[in-house]
C-alpha cells in the first residue's frame, strides 16, 4: 500500500475515521508522561504527527517541536493550528531522513504497518534522532488486548446462551487471518492490516534497536472502543494500547 496516497485520501475525514487516543485515554496516562518530560529548554519531534492532535500537549512543554508526517494534506491541517514554536516537515519515517537530534520524541500508532521490518525501521529512526540521554514515548497497539477483547466477546455471547462456535465469524474478523500473520501480531482493523505487539516483544525489539525501555504502561479505553453497544456490566479490565517510555543511552 502506498502510505502517502492512503493518508492523503483519508485526510478530509481523518478526525472521524482515526481513533483519538488523547480523548479516549481513560486515566490520562499520556498527560502524566508529557508532564514528566516537560522541559521548555528541550526540543521535540512528533513522529507521524498527522493533523496535529498532539500539538496542544507538546507545544507548551518544549522550546521547539518538529512535526513530521508522510501526508501533505494532513500537514496542511496541522499548519492551520498556528502554534508558534512548531514547524512541519513532510517525510517518510520508514526511510533515512535528515532530522535534527532532539531531547524528546513522541510517536503515536505509527510503527503499526503490516511489513514488520518497516516498523523496525521507524523505531531505529527514533533511536538515531534522539540525543544521548533523550527520551521517547511510543504508543502501539496491544496484541494481548486484541485477544482479551475477543475473549470478552465470547463471554458476552455465553451470557446470552450462544455457544462460541455459533458466533458469526464477522464478529472477530480481525483474528481470522493466516496463523503466521496472527502470530506476528498482524491483525485486521476495518479491513486494514495493523501490527500489534506483545509486552515481551516490545522489550526485545526496542533493545535490538538500541533503546532502553524504562516503562511499559497501559493506555486504557472504554469498551465502546471495541464494541458498538457494550453491555453495562462489562467493566475493567479495559482494552488498551501500550505506552512505551524509552531512552537512548
Label every model-predicted segment.
Residues 51-95:
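Class I SAM-dependent methyltransferase SAM/SAH-binding core
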Residues 106:
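A conserved beta-strand element that flanks and buttresses the S-adenosyl-L-methionine
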Residues 120-132:
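A short glycine-rich, Lys/Arg-flanked "PGG" loop and its adjoining helix->strand segment in the class I
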Residues 114, 185-201:
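Acceptor-substrate binding/catalytic loop of class I
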